[in-house]
């Protein structure tokens, strides 16, 4: 985990993420110590990122007809308890410059949903692994943490979509690897990935196809914390890291130590991956969550949040409940 001073330095360079994602522009201008990062021109607009704990989030109004659909047990408690990972990299879910407040696009979308449902948002900061257990047990009502819809996850959870999912292949800046676009490109490489993620499924599928074709197998290494896999990448213990495109693009831009050599849909080659809010299977919450998402998509609040975090290119036209997900892994 970066120190507070290192975190501040990284967050001060946050606008670079959006330049990396768009492939345009020049370097950023750091902001003041107040936590409001300096302006950065992107196309014809100027983007300002607030990394202070006082987020002034985009808010939405309650919609009584949708709020009435929330299961009575949750509605009666007056809170929407959202499981979220808070130790990641911008712009998804990360800590503000007070090193304790969870901010990012995930918590902002969760706030909009809670508003429409007439509930107070309570964020439950947890690990990636514990997030699934917390939702399954009912400890958390819903998970917002860059979760991709998969067919296997749909056996246990319900999903309401709110973003498209793109993944990136990230290498050291001086790596001889220049492009990863097909399974053969990773044959024989040492690749890190998060356990239990959709990118792990894609990686294992590509490796299986390589083995079947007689190519060298991938050496898969598992890391959950960014500090760990980036140290492994820098030291040469791994050749490539495979993770979410927004966070990888951010790291490549602000560190100067890595580069993006390819991207792929979070659903693999057969389907466009979709990021979704995750609820307990059959508990009745997923439909009002989806309705709330469609409300803020239609009234423009959703677009405001995505624009705020530089993720307008990951917008969807409508939220769906339990759409086709990443295919089951063949055994």
Say what each PLM segment does:
Residues 164-171, 253-291, 312-331:
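Periplasmic-binding protein-like
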Residues 120-185:
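Acidic, polar ligand-binding/catalytic clefts
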Residues 87-89, 100-116, 147, 165-225, ...:
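Bilobed "Venus flytrap"/periplasmic-binding protein-like clamshell domains
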Residues 147-154, 203-205, 235, 239-271:
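A ligand-binding cleft/hinge motif common to bilobed small-molecule-binding domains
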């Amino acid at each position: 985990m970066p120190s507070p001073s290192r975190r501040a330095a990284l967050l001060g360079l946050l606008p670079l993420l959006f330049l990396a994602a768009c492939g345009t522009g020049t370097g950023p201008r750091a902001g003041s110590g107040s936590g409001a990062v300096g302006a950065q021109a992107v196309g014809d607009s100027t983007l300002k990122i607030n990394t202070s704990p006082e987020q002034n989030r985009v808010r939405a109004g309650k919609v009584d007809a949708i709020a009435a659909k929330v299961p009575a047990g949750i509605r009666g408690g007056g809170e929407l308890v959202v499981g979220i990972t808070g130790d990641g990299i911008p712009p998804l879910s990360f800590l503000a410059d007070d090193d304790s407040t969870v901010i990012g696009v995930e918590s902002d979308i969760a706030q909009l949903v809670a508003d429409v449902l007439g509930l107070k948002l309570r964020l439950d900061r947890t690990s990636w692994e514990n997030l699934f257990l917390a939702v399954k047990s009912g400890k958390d009502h819903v998970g917002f943490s860059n979760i991709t819809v998969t067919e296997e996850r749909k056996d246990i959870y319900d999903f309401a979509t709110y973003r498209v999912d793109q993944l990136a292949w990230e290498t050291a800046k001086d790596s001889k690897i220049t492009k990863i676009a097909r399974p053969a490109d990773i044959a024989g490489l040492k690749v890190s990935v998060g356990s239990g993620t959709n990118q792990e499924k894609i990686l294992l599928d590509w490796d299986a196809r390589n083995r079947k074709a007689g190519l060298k197998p991938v050496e898969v290494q598992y890391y959950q914390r960014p500090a760990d896999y980036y140290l492994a990448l820098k030291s040469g213990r791994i050749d490539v890291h495979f993770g979410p495109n927004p966070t990888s693009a951010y790291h490549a831009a602000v560190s100067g130590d890595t580069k993006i050599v390819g991207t792929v849909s979070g659903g693999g080659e057969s389907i466009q991956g979709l990021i979704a809010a995750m609820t307990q299977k059959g508990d009745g919450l997923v439909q009002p969550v989806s309705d709330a998402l469609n409300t803020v998509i239609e009234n423009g609040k959703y677009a405001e949040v995505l624009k705020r975090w530089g993720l307008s290119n990951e917008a969807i036209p409508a939220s769906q409940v339990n759409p086709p997900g990443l295919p089951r892994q063949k055994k």
